């Protein structure tokens, strides 16, 4: 059966996504950074309030996926905490300076997360050789790979995604980045069995007073009086499309 994972930047969004029919949650913070590790409070709340599988992302900062020794120590601490909290899986990815999987560190990750589902996130889309990387990830025992097919959007990356599905002898290939209700059928037709989407909308702040000329972000064009939230209607519609589709085959 096809699975719909919703990327959520807060616990309220995760609750909304579950009620709308999501199969799994990727829990993050910091949407402007592409997703960072959620706070301890968010993790605790998610464990208490969400019944479907929640996989927190382990990513200490934005930018690339080649981490310093101190950053990796922080990541290991986060993995241990996430496991202690009882989460069934996590989302992570590490590359070396040459764009290959950091296999030494990923082996440590797999040891620390033993018994959990591990998703190798879109660090995969920045790797040097995707087919070799997939084989290395399979050898590590990673459960799935989240990928846009090394393109800005998964729709543009469908040729590589199809090839990865054909050649994968282990990890599930999950398409993500620009996966929407409007293009969902293309992924179904390509035989993709797991889809990752934010299914989001911008929601205006409830604040009446809005101080002009002052921003908490160096990117001054960012609207700080709105935020990204899950759209329940979109999640429900996407799930209905997936449930109505026949079992996939690679086109």
From Swiss-Prot:
Keywords: Cytoplasm. GO terms for molecular function: copper ion binding. SUPFAM superfamilies: CutC-like (SSF110395). Belongs to the CutC family. InterPro entries: CutC-like, CutC-like_dom_sf. Pfam families: CutC. PANTHER family: COPPER HOMEOSTASIS PROTEIN CUTC (PTHR12598), COPPER HOMEOSTASIS PROTEIN CUTC HOMOLOG (PTHR12598:SF0). HAMAP family: CutC. This is PF03932 family protein CutC.
